């Protein structure tokens, strides 16, 4: 029966290695589909294996579109050879379905005329009376030629397996007629037949999609098996290779109705085959006798490997391995090409074609154990003992000599076994370390990818916000420019009208002035003519109009002036704030210190009795009442001080304290061993490294002599960083992101603790608490 497009689709997906299959799934998720089809859920694609993936594709898209979509994805991930093979197979299958009736009839007539040696019995022995058995349950074995005895399985390309399947089976699933002599000395059948025409035992069961056809010979031990034909399900469809696994009878599988011979009959056949050689047809028509095989022949292993098979010393690929003949050398995974007859290869032994490691054929005599090393001092004495004092192997005579008298001498096998156990233990340890390293590398890669994604997201966010700001400023610019242009146009129109009116008044005045000047130069008789009218007009001439700004213009100009001042102030504030915030990243020491932040709490057992604490021991302030507390050696009795917890003797520690608007405080670190009774001097010699705010905006460090500190911006939050290894204590103004002071070259001879003092009340001005603030960062070194 011909393969369906679904079978070709599954075969193509199984050809993908895991890495390419993951690329296929990822590309499939991002490939657009036709509108009439719904997309496969992403979760199902991510969990799917080849069989499940093929089922999902056919279920959601149908066979034809599933094949088209698979071809599109394969080409997208540069799997063009697989895409071309699937394309040819799909075209061939569609053309085969159109001519299925004629091909079926032709193949049926062809199957009736097959040679007897190539026909498959309908009712094999051991299964008679059960009706016709469907294909795929274990076909009858065909006889193999003698040159195939030394041949192992080799993987073939997909196109070649299709050709073999199409040539070896007709439309009804029966083997087609083929020539007994095939190229390369291959047998026409999938396996060797037992004597008397009985079929070998073969069980098949379903396996995972990662499986492959692995045939183990069901005959006597040491017998090889040829590649089986394709197997078909009862429905008529070919069973995918990933669902077939051949199980040898040595696995004690449960009884299966598809078994051709029972285990008892197989054992009897093996015993019969072990007593006499069997004649086996060869490609040239002759016969050759097989070696005796069975339990009585010690030269044959239980796994069915001939005695002349040797492993490659470098890649450990077993020549003629019945599983898959794959070279498993660390740097080589090339499937080995199986040879024909052992004697047909000449003097050069076959080997792995990639790592070029030849598989030397060794005779049974060459497999004898090598002689044990002999003692150099005492000839012919085998070194069977080991001297642990000299760390060398010795013989029995050496152990009795004066040189080794009283030494620890043990059997060399016992010492070797002990060292093997140590080696195994170290190997396990190193493998665990390597696994841990791989996990850490994977974790590091994940974190790096996560950080890169976060960086890219922040970059896009900043760009988007700045674009919004730029767009807003651009809009405001257009608004102001347009408003000012409107006001300018209005002022221009008003000025033009005013100029017109004033020009008319000036022209009238110029006319009257001219007339009066002319009258002044005339004679008396002419002067007195019309003088009254001219003088009247001169007295009643209108005064030129004064300039008056319209109220609308005044209001608009005032409004624009106010807005411009607001924009100027806002822009200045925004620029200063942004510059200040950006300068916070210019203190790399503070950023590095914050990476070593620790969780610090207040130790109430060390506190001055008047101090009041919060429930979480993160905040402290000075109270009004003297609390009656146990006066232990660790409590301060005269200084308003409380220590922090935990103490530390190594590494680097960082914590931050909110001081707010307090007018006095003390912060820093001190030795755990300091005296806590009576008055004390805060200095490094006495074990105190602190910064003190004595009065408002007056700061000093407790050095000798005290160092006055000039701080431009009073800190609202103070950061303290202690590097025990270097011997330094640094103070930072977290608010201004600036450095305050550093005690360098300190001598720490014991554990240190954080120290806090909220200061005196200062007439009610200093009642606010000191609060330990959380800091994001890594833990201590």
Swiss-Prot record:
Residues 420-582 are annotated as: Required for homotrimerization and induction of pyroptosomes. A motif (Nuclear localization signal) lies at residues 420-437. GO terms for molecular function: actin binding; identical protein binding; ubiquitin protein ligase activity; zinc ion binding. Gene3D superfamilies: 2.60.120.920, Classic Zinc Finger (3.30.160.60), Death Domain, Fas (1.10.533.10). Residues 93-226, 270-322, 336-373 are annotated as: Disordered. GO terms for cellular component: autophagosome; canonical inflammasome complex; cytoplasm; cytoplasmic vesicle; cytosol; lamellipodium; microtubule; microtubule associated complex. The modification Phosphoserine is found at residue 242. Expressed in peripheral blood leukocytes, particularly in mature granulocytes and to a lesser extent in monocytes but not in lymphocytes. Detected in spleen, lung and muscle, probably as a result of leukocyte infiltration in these tissues. Not expressed in thymus, prostate, testis, ovary, small intestine, colon, heart, brain, placenta, liver, kidney, pancreas. Expression detected in several myeloid leukemic, colon cancer, and prostate cancer cell lines. Induction: In monocytes, up-regulated by treatment with colchicine and IFN-alpha, by the pro-inflammatory cytokines IFNG/IFN-gamma and TNF, by bacterial lipopolysaccharides (LPS) and by retroviral infection. Repressed in monocytes by the anti-inflammatory cytokines IL10/interleukin-10, TGFB1 and IL4/interleukin-4. In neutrophils and macrophages, up-regulated by IFNG/IFN-gamma with a peak after 8 hours of treatment. Residues 93-111 have a biased composition (Polar residues). The record marks 330-331 as: Cleavage. Changing residue 244 to P: No effect on PYCARD/ASC specks formation. Increased interaction with 14-3-3 proteins. Residues 266-280 are annotated as: Interaction with RELA. Changing residue 577 to A: Found in an autosomal dominant autoinflammatory disease with some similarities to familial Mediterranean fever; likely pathogenic. Changing residue 202 to Q: Benign; no effect on PYCARD/ASC inflammasome formation. Residues 413-442 form a coiled coil. Residues 580-775 form the B30.2/SPRY domain. Disulfide bonds: none annotated. Cleaved by CASP1. The N-terminal cleavage product localizes to the nucleus as a filamentous network and to the cytoplasm, interacts more strongly with RELA and NFKBIA than the full-length protein, enhances the nuclear localization of RELA and induces NFKBIA proteolysis. The C-terminal cleavage product localizes to the cytoplasm. The B box-type zinc finger interacts, possibly intramolecularly, with the pyrin domain; this may be an autoinhibitory mechanism released by PSTPIP1 binding. Homotrimer. Interacts (via the B box-type zinc finger) with PSTPIP1. Interacts (via the B30.2/SPRY domain) with several components of the inflammasome complex, including CASP1 p20 and p10 subunits, CASP5, PYCARD, NLRP1, NLRP2 and NLRP3, as well as with unprocessed IL1B; this interaction may lead to autophagic degradation of these proteins. Component of the AIM2 PANoptosome complex, a multiprotein complex that drives inflammatory cell death (PANoptosis). Interacts with NFKBIA and RELA. Interacts weakly with VASP and ACTR3. It is linked to Familial Mediterranean fever, autosomal recessive: A hereditary periodic fever syndrome characterized by recurrent episodic fever, serosal inflammation and pain in the abdomen, chest or joints. It is frequently complicated by reactive amyloidosis, which leads to renal failure and can be prophylactically treated with colchicine. Familial Mediterranean fever, autosomal dominant: A hereditary periodic fever syndrome characterized by periodic fever, serosal inflammation and pain in the abdomen, chest or joints as seen also in the autosomal recessive form of the disease. It is associated with reactive renal amyloidosis and characterized by colchicine unresponsiveness. Involved in the regulation of innate immunity and the inflammatory response in response to IFNG/IFN-gamma. Organizes autophagic machinery by serving as a platform for the assembly of ULK1, Beclin 1/BECN1, ATG16L1, and ATG8 family members and recognizes specific autophagy targets, thus coordinating target recognition with assembly of the autophagic apparatus and initiation of autophagy. Acts as an autophagy receptor for the degradation of several inflammasome components, including CASP1, NLRP1 and NLRP3, hence preventing excessive IL1B- and IL18-mediated inflammation. This is Pyrin.
